């Protein structure tokens, strides 16, 4: 009887094993059929045509091979299917995927061009076996291991733990994660600082080291300004937070490094996302209160088409900057600080809060107003140290200094004459083009220079703002006043090279030259 039952059990096991095998084969056939249907549907979406699959006939008859050979062929087919699907995803999304075990990491095409030579290195880093994490010298029910695996639960506890007054389950569900958008190379490691539970009654709520979760996203968001290189020795340090009241259990929080070395090499980016303001209280039995201090670091940014990594965007003009200081400097161009009154001349609004009391002309900055007022007063505060000539504006002095240095970096393309600044070159070009952009509103006469127009307009208004301090005679321009001063001083700076006779102005010298 016993032998019959044993034989019957053996037969049942064989049937069950055969049934399980048949179910697996059926499931495999169903999976392949679904894949074929999805492929045909994809072909229809791409071409708009329906196709019917037809089994390929073997001319040489059926081939019989051992099961291991067939299994290898199936594995190769699976790998080929995955490769084809990756190529399709790359065409549709512009992203290249590296898949290893549970991890999927997506790279943009620009990033992939930079790192595809190190594909094996990335895969080796991803394939590292999950680390087994154990409670340290603590009583732990049924001695279960907690694997630092993807999506793993942080800790187990028989009794429900709560966070603050919310009553939220902490030990069973709460996750603190550092989520790399793209896996860093193996050179970057996690350093664990061991902690030991003090002797005595231990809390039932043993909170094990928080695990690192690697999450692959369809659209990764790299951190701008922060990158990791294969050679960098930066690592994420695991800090130990201890409860200091009574009997307690140790708690660990993985914190992001304060600074990540920035390199020129395109490599894996990481995003730190730590939950904020956690206050955990383990209740029940002989337990102690635990507190997790606020720990938050969230780095965000957007990538640029050029591959440069940026963080900060100007809200006025949308210009990108890699540092906060650079953005702050740029924003001052939108709000120009003026004097002690804290008045602001807005570039975009063209506000000009400083008017000239003489002519009513307005300026955005007080310094510009001060420079302009010197044209009314005749003040020339800027002196040349080489020839002691004076100028009303610093820009005029800088232009004059180039004459002493012999700097004339701007040549005319027509005649080859060179000039110390661009503005002088632009004015000179009007000689060749005949351009006279400044016209008089009274008579329509045109002039090459704005100063000539200003002097001409005074003939209509009969304005003579420049008066002689000796005799009080007025003149419409400063050059006429300067020439007049020479009648009082007797100065004759222009001399004839033929006879040596001197003249007080250049025009008189030109008339004299005609006599020779």
Curated annotation (Swiss-Prot):
Signal peptide annotation: none
Gene3D superfamilies per the UniProt record, alphabetical: Classic Zinc Finger (3.30.160.60)
Chain positions of all zinc fingers (C2H2-type): 312-334, 354-376, 382-404, 410-432, 438-460, 466-488, 494-516
Main location, first listed in the record: nucleus
Stored InterPro entries: Znf_C2H2_sf, Znf_C2H2_type
An annotated GO BP: regulation of transcription by RNA polymerase II
Gene Ontology CC annotation, any one: nucleus
Coiled-coil region: none
Cited Pfam families: zf-C2H2
Keywords per UniProt: DNA-binding, Metal-binding, Nucleus, Repeat, Transcription, Transcription regulation, Zinc, Zinc-finger
Localization per record: Nucleus
Top-level taxon in the UniProt lineage: Eukaryota
Residue segments, region Disordered: 1-33, 200-220
An MF annotation (GO) of this entry: DNA-binding transcription factor activity
Ranges of biased composition (kind: Polar residues): 200-218
Role noted for this protein: May be involved in transcriptional regulation.
Protein's name in the database: Gastrula zinc finger protein XlCGF53.1
């Amino acid at each position: 009887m016993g032998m019959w039952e044993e034989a019957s059990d053996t037969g049942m096991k064989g049937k069950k094993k055969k049934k399980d095998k048949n179910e697996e084969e059926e499931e495999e056939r169903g999976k392949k059929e679904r894949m074929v249907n999805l492929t045909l549907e994809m072909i229809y979406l791409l071409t708009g045509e329906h196709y019917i699959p037809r089994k390929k006939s073997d001319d040489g008859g059926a081939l019989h091979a051992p099961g291991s050979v067939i299994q290898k062929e199936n594995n190769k087919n699976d790998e080929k299917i995955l490769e084809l699907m990756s190529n399709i995803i790359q065409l549709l999304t512009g992203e290249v995927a590296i898949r290893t075990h549970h991890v999927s990491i997506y790279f943009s095409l620009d990033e992939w061009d930079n790192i595809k030579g190190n594909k094996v290195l990335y895969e080796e880093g991803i394939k590292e076996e999950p680390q087994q994490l154990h409670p340290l010298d603590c009583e732990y029910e049924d001695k279960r291991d907690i694997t630092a695996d993807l999506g793993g639960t942080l800790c187990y506890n028989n009794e429900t733990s709560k966070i603050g007054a919310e009553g939220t389950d902490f030990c069973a569900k709460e996750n603190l994660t550092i989520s790399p958008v793209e896996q860093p190379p193996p050179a970057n490691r996690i350093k664990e600082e061991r902690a030991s539970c003090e002797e005595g009654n231990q809390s039932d709520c043993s909170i094990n080291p928080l695990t690192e979760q690697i999450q692959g996203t369809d659209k990764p968001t790299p951190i701008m300004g922060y990158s990791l290189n294969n050679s960098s020795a930066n690592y994420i340090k695991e800090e130990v937070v201890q409860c200091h009241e009574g009997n307690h259990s140790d708690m660990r929080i993985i914190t992001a490094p304060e600074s990540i070395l920035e390199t020129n090499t395109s490599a894996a980016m990481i995003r730190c996302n730590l939950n904020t303001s956690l206050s955990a209280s383990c209740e029940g039995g002989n337990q102690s209160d635990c507190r997790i201090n606020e720990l938050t670091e969230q780095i965000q940014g957007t990538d640029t088409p050029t591959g440069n990594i940026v963080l900060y965007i100007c809200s006025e003009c949308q210009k990108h900057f890699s540092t906060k200081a650079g953005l702050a400097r740029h924003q001052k161009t939108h709000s120009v600080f003026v004097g002690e009154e804290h008045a602001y001349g807005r570039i975009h609004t063209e506000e000009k809060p400083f008017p000239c009391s003489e002519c009513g002309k307005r300026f955005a900055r007080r310094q510009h107003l001060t420079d302009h007022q010197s044209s009314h007063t005749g003040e020339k505060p800027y002196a040349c140290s080489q020839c002691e000539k004076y100028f009303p504006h610093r820009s005029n002095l800088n232009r004059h200094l180039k004459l002493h240095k012999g700097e004339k970096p701007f040549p005319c393309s027509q005649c080859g004459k060179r000039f110390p600044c661009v503005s002088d070159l632009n004015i000179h070009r009007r000689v060749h083009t005949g351009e006279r952009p400044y016209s008089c509103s009274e008579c329509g006469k045109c002039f090459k220079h704005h100063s000539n127009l200003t002097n001409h307009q005074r003939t209509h208004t009969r304005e003579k703002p420049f008066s002689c301090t000796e005799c009080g005679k007025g003149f419409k321009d400063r050059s006429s006043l300067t020439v007049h001063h020479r009648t009082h001083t007797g100065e004759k700076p222009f001399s004839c090279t033929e006879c040596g006779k001197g003249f007080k102005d250049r025009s008189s010298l030109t008339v004299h030259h005609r006599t020779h």
